[in-house]
Amino acid sequence: MSMKSIEEWASTIADQSGKIILITGANTGLGFEDARFLAGKGTHIIMACRDLDKANSAKKTILDEHPGGVLDVLQLNLADFASIDEFSARVLDTYSQLDVLINNAAAIMTPYQKTTQSFELGFGVNHLGHFRLTALLLPLLLKTSNARVVNVSSSAHKFGKIDFENLNSEKKYKPMKAYGQSKLANLLFTYELQRRVSTAGKQLLVVASHPGWAKTHPPRSRLQGWMSKLMIQSAAMGALSTILAAVGNNIEGGKYYGPGGFMEVRGFPKEVQSSKMARDIDLATKLWTASEKLTGISYDSILST
């Protein structure tokens, strides 16, 4: 089916009333567009955000467009395990279901920084933070019928490599290399979690998405401005891949969704292929073991109950 507008594509997504969807980083960029779209489909949104002022401002913007929307703002700092633990406990105590967890928030090619637990910020937030969060919310997801986990990756994963000797980028830090590593980790986590969930006989779809080249912030240079006019799509378009993965029909676990246009840069979403490295089961197992050790989390104990 050839699409001409976001509105036309949106008409293919059914009403989602009765569902509760949690989105990390829902106050800006792709996460905001996810929340805005899904609120319009009747979804109860949990906006998990670090900055409450920005989150409440984003909530107001969405409610201005969708006055009947239900959006809860909860504070979550993915760079701090204590915040993740406190947030997760609050979610488990407050909600009786969780239909979709969208792990969207990301630290993108920042100057070198560390999380509270001294992990490189990108790897700590983009991978380890979401790895711990997902584990803590897994009991609620598993008791919710037809639940899904969506990990937002990036085409940058194709340039990534998991450097187990330098996961924290302490020996040498290159922002793009570190970002690619974290986005590759997102995909390895996606596929391995789906394998483990399936092996345990649990009903949960774990999928990944990427936005293509989406405009999530103003151009930072003349070159970026020129490129954005030529190739970069809007954040609203970029968010459609995640929305399809989260609530679309005929979605399969362990799949990857992104723009269907030239080189997956832009376009309406479809199933796409990740890199060969992202599909490396041995690499995924090794990263899983390292991630459990670094986060102090055991998925086996959760999946065995």
Feature roles, as predicted:
Residues 175, 179, 231, 276-280:
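Alpha-helix initiation/capping motif
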Residues 50, 79, 232-233, 240, ...:
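Residue-level signal for the nucleotide or nucleotide-sugar donor/cofactor binding architecture
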Residues 85-88, 235-246, 281-288:
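Short, amphipathic alpha-helical "lid/cap" segments that border enzyme active or binding sites
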Residues 2-4, 9-11, 247, 251-305:
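C-terminal tail/cap regions
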Residues 196-275:
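SDR active-site lid
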Residues 80, 166, 229, 247-248, ...:
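Polar helix-capping/helix-linker motif
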Residues 2-220, 294-305:
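Rossmann-fold NAD(P)H-dependent dehydrogenase/reductase core
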